[in-house]
């Protein structure tokens, strides 16, 4: 079982890391993307830390992470922010980050996979 990023690293470690990231890459947003706890059988993502441009949309982010998850074309990928909010694909990452950023400086996104053909 893969530990969640919040459990694997202390708050201080995460805060220190995002502070450095924001200093070095002011035009990027630090994001952690992990599978939802409810998706026991879903494949793990091969990379969970991302630095995305502020002008990226959720749809573009989905397009960029889909190859990093071993799913078939008949499976839909859904993202949840703050484990409760499903943003529209046209939502801007900067706005989502500003609204839902954790105190440690990361935006935490979880993904769920659903079969589109039953």
How should these model regions be labeled?
Residues 1-118:
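Ubiquitin system architectures
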